[in-house]
Amino acid sequence: MYNVANKRTLLGVAMAMLLFSCGGKDTDTERAEAIVNQADSAITAGDYDLAVTLLDTLKSRYPREIKVQRGAMNLRPRAIEGQTIRQIEITDSMLAASSHRRDSMMNYFSFVNNPELVEGYYVIKEYANSSLFNRTGVEARITPEGEFYIISSLNAKPVKHTSLSLKNQAGEVSTATVDYDGDRNYRSGGTEMITFVGAECDTLGQFLTDNRGAATILIFNGAKSYSTPLSKLDRKSIEQTYEMANVLTENRKLNLKRDFLDRQLQVARDQIARTTQEPAADDKD
């Protein structure tokens, strides 16, 4: 595979040759054909990016050379095919690493299928059978689709909380505010519970990831505030679940990219097939 320096060198040489040829007495047709030949050579050498750049130059500099451009119609899909195959190789490597990381981390999680909920969720194994409603603290979870969320529970002191904060020597971060609605912000029997979803609470996950091991205070913000040390398990729940959610998101995006590249490769090959000229009858003899 060509590195960036090699690509820049080849591109510079190619463009210099083009400028030199433009200064001579060659016709536009001859100059356009020279670009086509250089693009073809770049494809043969495996420098697909250079080939695409040359073909773009052909199109912009010699738009009236229709015959030459038609003769080069097969080159662009060939270059795109080469580019796409390389992107697939890179994506496959990244996907393999991401999948290995996902599978390794999944050993620390359990899937909880609660019939009272619309869908189940992943949680660290230590909290697979926890009863968050009966304690003060937080619990991080992941949906089957990989969305990160945090549920807070406060029964030590009613403050009608609508947000959470984490504070340590590095600073302080907070979730978004979720106003009381009896659904995501729920109060019953002296217990206050809120579900914070995705971007509403990912700042907490990133904060703990950036400050591993630092003693941290959990703050319930509302009409009043209530502070308590963030327990080791609650911290582990947020840190590991946030990391797992990022891995699942990365894995999903890589799979989507792989599917896109497969489709792109097929389109390029279909175009190659349509633009490949059959040899003349005399050439077959």
Regions found by a protein language model. Give the residues of each.
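Internal interaction segment
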Residues: 188-202, 213-285
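Short solvent-exposed coil/turn linkers within tandem alpha-helical repeat scaffolds
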Residues: 59-71
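TPR-repeat structural position
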Residues: 48-49
